Amino acid sequence: QIVLTQSPAIMSASPGQKVTMTCSASSSVSYMHWYQQKSGTSPKRWIYDTSKLASGVPARFSGSGSATSYSLTITSMQAEDAATYYCQQWSSNPLTFGAGTKLELKR
C-alpha cells in the first residue's frame, strides 16, 4: 500500500502570507487529491487530479507535483482557510490518505 506523508503536521500563517504544504508518496502515483476539513464537519474535496480546483474553491489555492512529490499552495492566507488538509491517492489500491496538515491562523 502507498503511504502518504504530509509535512508539516501543524503550521500557522498570518493573513496574506503564502502557504505551502507537501505530500510525499512512498511510490509513484499518477495524481494527488486534496481535501479540506474544518472542525465538526465532513471533509470537502478541494483539489483533484493534482491541480484542478473543486467547484467553489478560491483561485488562491493551487496544487502541483508529480510522481512521489506533491504540494498544495495558498497564495494569500485568509482566515477561512484555517482547516486540516488531507492528501489522497487512488492510483493504487487500496486508496490511502495522508495524516493531514493542520493549518492555523496566526493573528
UniProtKB/Swiss-Prot annotation:
One of its GO terms (biological process) is immune response. The keyword Amino-acid biosynthesis does not apply. Keywords: Adaptive immunity, Disulfide bond, Hybridoma, Immunity, Immunoglobulin. Residues 1-23 are annotated as: Framework-1. Disulfide bonds join 23-87. Residues 88-96 are annotated as: Complementarity-determining-3. This is Ig kappa chain V-VI region NQ2-17.4.1. It comes from Mus musculus (Mouse).
